[in-house]
Each structure stands twice: as structure tokens, then as C-alpha cells.
Amino acid sequence: HLCLWIFPYIDENSKYFKEAEEKGFLVKNTKGVTSRFYSTATSTSKVGCFDFTNPHFIEWYKPKVRSVVSMGIGAVKTDFSEAVPEDAVYFDGSTGIQGHNKLTFLYAKTIYDIMAEVKIPLGELPMLWGRSGYAGSHTIPAAWAGDSSTHLNNHACILRGGLSASMSGIPFWGFDMGGFYNTDHEGYECVPTDEEYI
């Protein structure tokens, strides 16, 4: 089965950015303009965040994702959604702080609902790996722990996180076995040691 990766941001250089912005489908800032930010520390261009509190956006977005899922996609990994600035203002009036966790759930739920619409009529189960979550995330089948460090002491933290997730009702949970990246004492990414890698 093929698993696709998706994130809730759109690069400001994308040909679809202007359309989404003009339709009011991107999270705004307190000045009423699209909130643009760097999604990672190494990003070279800014992004806007899709506003999953806007029902008009959901109507516009679902057919686009559904068309891809209908090609036979077995699972979707919903990545990111935590980087929205605190001065954000969502369609439903939530501030960046109020909507921070709500966005992560609505994003995953939207994708999961699309998966269910496509998969259940085929007699298949929808599968979504969600990175971030909130109240209600237990209704989505699986959680992924995100980009974990390869340091051996980090494995204990990941295990605690997985146990906590299971106690919160999340039935399936996974992580990057052996870690995804390594950082040195200054916080710079570096190559894992042979022991950490294995």
C-alpha cells in the first residue's frame, strides 16, 4: 500500500496560494492579512496555513484530496500543523493560541473523513498517521511520534509518549525506529553514530 505525506501549509510561491488567499481559505493575522511564516527552521520561503475552521475551505479542499486518495492510496501521513503563529486569527474567530490544538485535530479529521468516504464503500478501512493531536484524536486510527532524535536517551522519551498516547485511547502508534535525525550538544543536526543508527 502506498502512503502519501501531506501538510496543511501552502508555499507562497505556489500557483494555488493566490487562489486560496483570495477565497479567504488561509489563516490570517491580527491585521486581517494572510499569516505568512516559515514552517521549519531551514525553510527558504514562507507558507500560509489552510484554515480548517472555515467550512467553505473544506468544501473546496475535499475534492482535491479525494481525487488523489481515489487513485488507490492506502494511507496518508498528516505532518506539521503546529507552527501557526500566536497572532493568527482563524475563520471561526479563534486566536492563534486558542486554535493551536484545534487546528491539528481538524486538519487530521478532514483528511481522515476523506479517506473514509473513499475507502469504506470499497470495503477497505481508512488509514491515517497523524503527527499532532488534541481532544478527539483517539477517533483517528494511528499516531506517529514525529521526527525523533537518534540519541539513545530519546528512545525512552518516545516510549513514554507512546504509552501516554495509548492511555489516551489512541489504538495504534508508531515512530521513526532508530530516530530520524541527530543533534550535537549545540543543537545542530549531525550524522548519527553507528550505534545510534543500528
Segments and roles (model prediction):
Residues 1-198:
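Catalytic-domain carbohydrate-binding cleft regions of carbohydrate-active enzymes
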